[in-house]
């Protein structure tokens, strides 16, 4: 769902930082 996509994006952002 939308929340899952947002969570996935948040995880990617965390990995980039």
Swiss-Prot record:
Organ and tissue specificity: Expressed by the skin dorsal glands.
UniProt keyword Secreted present: yes
Disulfide-linked positions: none
InterPro entries: Antimicrobial_8
Subcellular location: Secreted
Entry keywords, A to Z: Amidation, Amphibian defense peptide, Secreted
Pfam short name (any one): Antimicrobial_8
GO biological process: defense response
GO cellular component terms given for this protein: extracellular region
Residues found modified as Valine amide: 17
Protein name stated in the entry: Uperin-3.2
Organism: Uperoleia inundata (Floodplain toadlet)
């Amino acid at each position: 769902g939308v929340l899952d996509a947002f969570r996935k994006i948040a995880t990617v952002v965390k990995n980039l930082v």
